[in-house]
Amino acid sequence: MFVVVETGGKQYKVSVGSMVNVEKLKANVGDEVVLDKVLLVGKEDEVIIGQPYVEGAKVIAKVVRQDKYPKVIVFKFKRKKHYRRKYGHRQPYTQLSIKEIVLPH
């Protein structure tokens, strides 16, 4: 069984036991978070599509890590004008371990 869950403005396909990197959440390492914006539930014999969300469905996940992605370097350059600008960006993320998927009855 799998579900498509929305968090941080993005959609992720998850199943029990999977690890997923999502946009940074305000939670400490070891905390459990509940993701209740479930868009789709896929079972072996049926698919439940939410309008926009599946009522009563939620995903319980554990925060494994709060970290940053590797640095992305941005370099701006204008020829003949001696204009150069270099800066970097590291996007923070939260790594979740999916513990349980709760479905409506």
Curated annotation (Swiss-Prot):
Question: Per the record, a Pfam family?
Answer: Ribosomal_L21p
Biological process terms from the Gene Ontology for this record are: translation
A cellular component term from Gene Ontology for this protein is:
cytoplasm
State the source organism's domain of life: Bacteria
What's a Gene Ontology MF term here? rRNA binding
Which keywords, in A-to-Z order, does the entry hold? Answer: Ribonucleoprotein, Ribosomal protein, RNA-binding, rRNA-binding
Family matches, as InterPro entries = bL21-like (IPR028909), bL21-like_sf (IPR036164), Ribosomal_bL21 (IPR001787), Ribosomal_bL21_CS (IPR018258)
Q: Tell me which family the UniProt entry assigns to this protein.
A: Belongs to the bacterial ribosomal protein bL21 family.
What this protein is reported to do is described as: This protein binds to 23S rRNA in the presence of protein L20.
How this chain assembles, per its entry, is: Part of the 50S ribosomal subunit. Contacts protein L20.
Give the NCBIfam families listed for this entry: L21 (TIGR00061)
Q: Output this protein's name.
A: Large ribosomal subunit protein bL21
Q: Which organism is it from?
A: Dictyoglomus turgidum (strain DSM 6724 / Z-1310)
